[in-house]
From Swiss-Prot:
Role: Component of the coat protein complex II (COPII) which promotes the formation of transport vesicles from the endoplasmic reticulum (ER). The coat has two main functions, the physical deformation of the endoplasmic reticulum membrane into vesicles and the selection of cargo molecules.
Family under the similarity heading: Belongs to the SEC23/SEC24 family. SEC23 subfamily.
Amino-acid positions noted as binding Zn(2+) in the UniProt annotation, renumbered to this chain: 59, 62, 81, 84
Listed name of the protein: Protein transport protein SEC23 E
Keywords, sorted A to Z: Cytoplasmic vesicle, Endoplasmic reticulum, ER-Golgi transport, Membrane, Metal-binding, Protein transport, Transport, Zinc
rRNA processing listed as a keyword: no
Pfam families assigned: Gelsolin, Sec23_BS, Sec23_helical, Sec23_trunk, zf-Sec23_Sec24
Region described as Zinc finger-like: 59-84
Cell location: Cytoplasmic vesicle, COPII-coated vesicle membrane; Endoplasmic reticulum membrane; Membrane
CDD domains per UniProt: Sec23-like, Sec23_C
A GO cellular component entry from the record: COPII vesicle coat
Taxonomic superkingdom: Eukaryota
GO molecular-function term, one example from the UniProt record: zinc ion binding
Amino acid sequence: MAETANTDLEGIDGVRMTWNVWPHSKAEASKCVIPLAACISPIRRHADIPTLPYAPLRCRTCSAALNAYAQVDFTAKLWICPFCYQRNHFPPHYHVISETNLPGELYPQYTTVEYTLPPPVANGEGLVDPPVFVFVLDTCMIEEELDFAKSALKQAIGLLPENALVGFVSFGTQAHVHELGFSEMSKVFVFKGDKEISKDQILDQLGLGGSSRRGGSKGPQNGFPSSGLNRFLLPASECEFTLNSLLDELQSDQWPVKPGHRSQRCTGVALSVAAGLLGACLPGTGARIVALIGGPCTEGPGTIVSKDLSDPVRSHKDLDKDAAPYYKKAVKFYDSIAKQLVTQGHVLDLFASALDQVGVAEMKVAVERTGGLVVLSESFGHSVFKDSFKRVFEDGDQALGLCFNGTLEICCSQDIKIQGAIGPCSSLEKKGASVADTVIGEGNTSAWRLCGLDKTTCLTIFFDISSSGSNTPGAANPQFYLQFLTSYQNPEGQTLLRVTTVCRQWIDSAVSSEELVQGFDQETAAVVMARLASLKMESEEGFDATRWLDRNLIRLCSKFGDYRKDDPASFTLNPYFSLFPQFIFNLRRSQFVQVFNNSPDETAYFCMLLNRENISNATVMIQPSLTTYSFNSPAEPALLDVASIAADRILLLDAYFSVVVFHGMTIAQWRNMGYHHQPEHQAFAELLQAPQEDSQMIVRERFPVPRLVVCDQHGSQARFLLAKLNPSATYNNANEMSTGSDVIFTDDVSLQVFFEHLQKLVVQS
C-alpha cells in the first residue's frame, strides 16, 4: 500500500519536495516555517526511465545537461539552457534532429533519463571494474557466535559474482590480513592492535609500499589488480575454497582475558588496515569493507570503553554530561577513516551483533559519509542479521541494487542557493554561485560523493532563495528548475549517469497563499523535520527537540490555520495540512526524539536509517501503520490508538524496525484451544493466517530485515505494540473503556489533549 502511494507520488523522477511551489522572496520563504527541501532517491528503479547509449550534452556555461525543458531552435541547431539561458550549438551527430525526430532526452515525458558512459581509458578497452569486497571479522566472540558469523560469510561468498574480488581481515587483540593468493598454506600479516598505524606503515608491512604499488593508477588492470596485489584480493571463483577452509580453521581469539575484564578488541586498527589495503590496490574503484563486529573496541584507536567490566559503556546521560572519556577521540579517529575512504571512493558496511554496545555511535560518521549499510542485532544467529546479510549479496527481485562510486551534482535556477544535504553522502567542497552561506548537514558545495548507494537511498537537499532585493525571482520566468546529475558504477561495473530535471512554479505568497497550501507535501515535511531535528540533536549542545518541534508546529498552524483570535473551538486546518500535527505528535514520542530509552548505538542506528530511506519508509518509522483483522470485515487500516485493541481482533503493527502481530484475548484463547485445527473453524484458521502472511511480505521486502514479534493481549511482549499507540485510554480513565479493550499505563498526553493544547496556543492573541 505504502509502496504504491510512494510510486504515485515520486513518479519517474524519484523527487518529493516539502513545498511544490516556492515563494519568490527570502522573507516569504522564512514565513513558511518548513524549509524548502527536496528528497531525492537518485537511482530509484522505474520502468519508464529510458537508457540512452551515449554521453549527455552539457551547457558550456553552467554544465547542466540537455533536458526536456530546454528551448530548441531546430533550424539553427541550437538549444537554450533553462538554468543560465546560455545558447549552445548541437554537435554534428545531432544534425538529424527535428520536431518529429527528437533525441530521448528532449521527450517531454522523460524528465529523468539515464546515460551509459564508456568505461575509463585506464581500464583498457571495453573492460569494466569488478565489485570488490573486503570482509573484516571479529574473533573476540564465543564459539557459537563466531560459528554463526562464519556460516553467514560462507553463504555470502557463494552468492558473490565470480569476478568479484575478495579480501579477508580477521581481528581480536591483533589484526590479521590473510594472503588468499598464497594457497600452499595459511599466510597472515599481523598488526599490533594497541596503537594507531599510518597508511604508509600498513603498506610497507604488507609489501605494497613504494615501487611495488601502482602509483595513483585507477582501477585494476585488465579487470584485475596487478600481480603484486592479487596476493590479497582474488576473484571469488578462485579463492572460495581457500577462504572456506580458512574460515573452518579460524578460532575465537586466543589471547587470554582476565576475569572481570572485556576481550581486547582492536576494531579501529582492523578497519584502518582494510582501508589502507583497498587504497593501495584499488583507489577510485567500487569497493566495500564489510565489517562483522561482536563487541566494543577496547584496544588501540577507536576504543569506546576500558577493558574493566565494572566500567559501563557510555550512555546518553554520559554524552550529555561530557562524561564519556573515550567518545570524542574515537569519533575523531573514525572521522579520519571516513575521509580516507571517501577520497578512495570506498564504502564501510557495518553489521553489529551483540547484547552490549559495539560503538555504532562512534562509527556512524564513517558508515554514513561513505553510504554504507548498517544492521544492528542481538546475535549473529538472529534472523535480523542472517536474513539482512544474505539480502546484501542476493540477486533477482530481492536484490538491494548495490551501486558504487557515485557523485551527485545539482544545478539550479538563478536565485536558488543550496544549503546542504542530509543523508549517506560527503561534501566534495565544490563552490559556486549556487552555494548558500548558511550550511545544513554536508554543505558548502553543489556536489557530493556517494561511495555507496542503492535503490532506496534517499538524500534531503536544503535550498534557500537569494536575498538580492533588486531582482525578484519569477519576474521574468514563472518557473524554476532543479537538475540532479548522479553518476555511479552499477553492480555489473558499468558507469551510468542519471539526469533528473524538475520544474516548479514561483508564486507571490504575500498576495495569495492558496497555491502554496496546495503544494504542501505533509509526509515529506514530517520526514524533513525529523531529519533536521536529528541533525540538531547531534550537532547542537543542549538542543531541546521536543520544544523546537512544538514551536515550529505552532508557527505553521498560526500561519496556515483558519481561526478567530482567542477562540480555540474556531480553529480548523486545511486538508493539505490536517495530518501534519499527528505526524509531529508521533515524532515527539518516537525513538528519534525520546532517546533516553535507547543506547547511543541504537539511536545512531535509527538515525542513519531515517536519513537514508525513502519518504514512505521514513514516514512509517515516524508514524507506524496499524492494520486490523476480524471476522466481521476484511483487513483494513486502523487508528494508531489503544482504542483499536479488541478481544476479537488481530492487529498488525508495522513500526519499520519491528513488525508486531498482536492477538486479542479471545483470539489467543481460541488459538490455544486449537480451534484453528478443526475443519468447522476454517474461517478462524484463515483469520490467523492472514496477518502472518502480510507480516512475512513486509519482512521479505525490507532492509534491514525487521524484528518480527508475535504476541498476545496482556502478554509480556505486548509492550512492543502498546509503546507505539496513542494513549487515549490510561489508568486515569480506564473506567470509560469497553470490555476487551486495553489501557496504557503512562502519563504521556494523548493526541486529543495534544491537539487541544495546540489549538489554544495557536489562537492566542
